[in-house]
Regions:
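Short glycine-rich anion-binding loops that position phosphate/pyrophosphate groups of nucleotides
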Residues: 11, 61-64, 93-96
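Catalytic beta-strand/loop module used to bind and position nucleotide/cofactor moieties
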Residues: 70-100, 107-116
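Conserved strand-to-helix beginnings and helix N-cap segments that scaffold or border functional pockets
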Residues: 17-20, 68-72, 102, 122
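N-terminal beta1-alpha1 ligand-phosphate binding loop
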Residues: 1-23, 27
């Protein structure tokens, strides 16, 4: 299953950009991953257009919270559905996602109840995806 991460704006914080590069390199061994940075003009339309045909997951503080193991189980469930060829994680800009945008997505997940910058949300997402893929490959998990 292809994983697409769509974010509004490139990371400007040097440590966030470094974190993205680190996890992007790690994930290349496990998954077909692409990260795309979109311009802030009409971000909802841009995110929806670029994710057309994918299973859309909006990342928003109002979404469903899951543990790493629950995310891994959800990935396994999505992979088991043959019609889903790609999953797109949609990270909005500073104002987050509107309720009408979230309704157009297949799911809304929360990385935390805390508000965080969108560039940090991308790093947290990639780190969790890395954990999910290592778990799926049978790596030991210290939380079990």
């Amino acid at each position: 299953m292809k994983v697409i991460c769509l974010a509004i704006g490139k990371p400007k914080l040097s440590f966030a950009a470094q974190g993205v590069r680190e996890y992007e390199a790690r994930l290349q061994h496990y998954s077909s991953l692409s990260i795309e940075y979109l311009k802030a003009r009409d971000e909802s339309a841009a995110l929806l257009s670029r994710s057309e045909g994918a299973y859309r997951i909006a990342l928003d503080e109002r979404g469903t919270q899951m543990s790493t193991l629950e995310i891994a189980q959800e990935f396994t469930r999505l992979e088991g559905r043959g019609e889903i060829k790609s999953v797109a994680f949609l990270i909005g800009g500073a104002d987050g996602h509107s309720s009408s945008f979230r309704e157009q997505c297949d799911a809304t997940w929360s990385l935390s109840r805390m508000t965080m910058q969108h560039e940090l949300a991308l790093v947290v997402l990639l780190e969790q995806l890395y954990r999910v893929y290592t778990l799926k490959r049978g790596a030991p998990y210290h939380r079990e």
